[in-house]
Amino acid sequence: MEADITNLRNKLKECEDERLKAAQYGLQLLERQTELQSQLDKCHEEMMTTAENYNQEKYALQREVELKSRMLESLSCECEALRQQQKAQLEQLEMQLHRSHRQEVHGLRNKLENLKVELDEARLSEKQLKQKLDHQGELLSHKSEELRLLSEQRALSSVSSELLSLQTELTEAEGVKNALREEVNELQCKQEQLECLNASLLHQVDRLKEEKEEREKEAVSYYNALEKARVENQDLQVQLGHALQQAADPNSKGNSLFAEVEDRRVAMERRLNLMKDKYQSLKKQNAFTRDQMNKMKLQISTLLRMRGSQTEFEQQERLFAMLEQKNGEIKHLLGEINKLEKFKNLYENMESKSSTSDSACALEDSTYYTDLLQLKLDKLNKENESTKGELSIQRMKALFESQRTLDIERKLFANERHLQLSESENLKLRAKLDELKLKYEPEERIEVPVLKRRREVLPLNINTPEETAAASATGEDVSRLPLERKEESCLDNLKDNTVQWKQPASLSPHKSLPLDTQPKKEKCVTLVASPASTEVLHEQSGNTPSSPRLTEESRLPTKVKERKEATSKLEKGASKKSHTIMYVSSKSTPEMQCPQQ
């Protein structure tokens, strides 16, 4: 029992010792935990302070970066402005130098031509003087021979009087012959002088034409610069209006409801005034453009017959544009080919490097991956070849279509040229027919009934636009020509709107006007008595009818007067119908290149 008690007491002591040790260890752990917690708090505070410092530095650096970026933007804007100013000044200097050089060249050309003309005249005068000198020498020799013969005849006293009279007549005839020869030589000299003068005048005409073309180009450049200045002025006016609106911002005023309403009313009034000003300016510009368009129409009416090579010029421009487009595509494809070759070389280098690096590794694993990659590569190569074949087919189709469109365009332009030639020949034949009728047809033939003559139904809107344009073009000065591009576009629109009978319906179905949808009896015009056509031809030629047959229109029957009234009514209707004008840009677009596309 005592042994058990002692054992239990020993165990109790051991347990108490262990409990004391555990308590000591717990106290030590608590102390360490408090120390670690305090260290953690200190670290957290330090981290917060450092984070705040970093954030402040970050914001400061961001502000500095923003300021520097703004400064860079302002500097870049100033640099761009200076570049533009320098560029504009350089362009102005180049233009001035070009003009001065051109003026000097013109002056030198004029001097050279004058010197050439003077040299030709001097050579001609020298040649004429030589001819006169030779002629005078011949005359002198003839006179000396005559004097010698006369002296011999006087010496011979046995000569009869008849022989002397014949000799005197012979000398008189020779004198007349020499006088006629001198007159012929003088006339030849005058003819040569006139030919030389004509050649010099032709050279002057060519030079004046070149100067006129250069002046037209200068006028075009001036007009373009004026349009740019107008656009810039309008932009500046719009910016000024925005600046005034921002200066009168209602947000800077009071917050009351009435003040906001008043501010809005003032802003709307300002906008209304701006819109009125814009409306007035646009109205003036529209009136100016209308006047310009009328002048251009009058000038175009005089230039309609000189428009033979314009279709060829437009076709040449279109072909040049297509050539530039194809050259750009070729350059782009060559660049892509170079890129693909570079990529292929890099890929081969990478494959060689990877093969050398992986050769030292396990060969069994690499064979599987290489086979897999080889299969994928073969598959991709097949797909690439198929896509290349499809691409080549598409390119061939595109080339075929482009060639087809070019052939169609060539046929179209050839047909238009033949149409213009046939129209001009038709007009000439009609003019000749009317002149022959007025010259050789008696007046009694006019009173023959109309049923016995052959009639031909013609649309009366054939000559009305050219008639009105030619009649108005006689009173206008055609010395000033506007822009060439606007002239071409307006000319095309004028022909599309007024001369719809000239173009086939398959090419421009959206522009044809149904002028002949309702045929009437008044539209039948006889080919025998057609005073309206003669008047049209005289108005197109710009000359008033001066023949006595045209002044006696009051003696014609009433049918001719009724036809005149009908033609005047139809002319008014045609002039009212042909008021729609479409403005076409001078740039070559794919829609404008060929209407069949």
From Swiss-Prot:
Cell compartment(s), UniProt: Cytoplasm, Cytoskeleton, Microtubule organizing center, Centrosome; Chromosome, Centromere, Kinetochore; Nucleus; Cytoplasm, Cytoskeleton, Spindle pole
Coiled coil: 1-445
Subunit structure of this chain's protein: Interacts with KNTC1 and ZW10. These interactions appear weak and may be transient or indirect. Interacts with dynein intermediate chain and dynactin (DCTN1). Interacts with the catalytically active form of USP45.
Protein's name in the database: Protein Spindly
Keywords annotated in UniProt: Acetylation, Cell cycle, Cell division, Centromere, Chromosome, Coiled coil, Cytoplasm, Cytoskeleton, Kinetochore, Mitosis, Nucleus, Phosphoprotein, Ubl conjugation
Listed GO MF terms: enzyme binding; kinetochore binding
Gene that this sequence comes from: Spdl1
Post-translational modification: Monoubiquitinated with'Lys-48' linkage. Deubiquitinated by USP45.
Cellular component GO terms held in the UniProt record: centrosome; cytoplasm; nucleus; outer kinetochore; spindle pole
Free-text function comment from the UniProt entry: Required for the localization of dynein and dynactin to the mitotic kintochore. Dynein is believed to control the initial lateral interaction between the kinetochore and spindle microtubules and to facilitate the subsequent formation of end-on kinetochore-microtubule attachments mediated by the NDC80 complex. Also required for correct spindle orientation. Does not appear to be required for the removal of spindle assembly checkpoint (SAC) proteins from the kinetochore upon bipolar spindle attachment.
Biased composition (Polar residues): 540-549, 583-597
Region (Disordered): 531-597
Location of Phosphoserine modifications: 508, 547
GO biological process, one term: establishment of mitotic spindle orientation
HAMAP family listed in its UniProt record: SPDLY
Organism: Rattus norvegicus (Rat)
Family: Belongs to the Spindly family.
Residues bearing PTM N-acetylmethionine: 1
Biased composition (Basic and acidic residues): 550-574
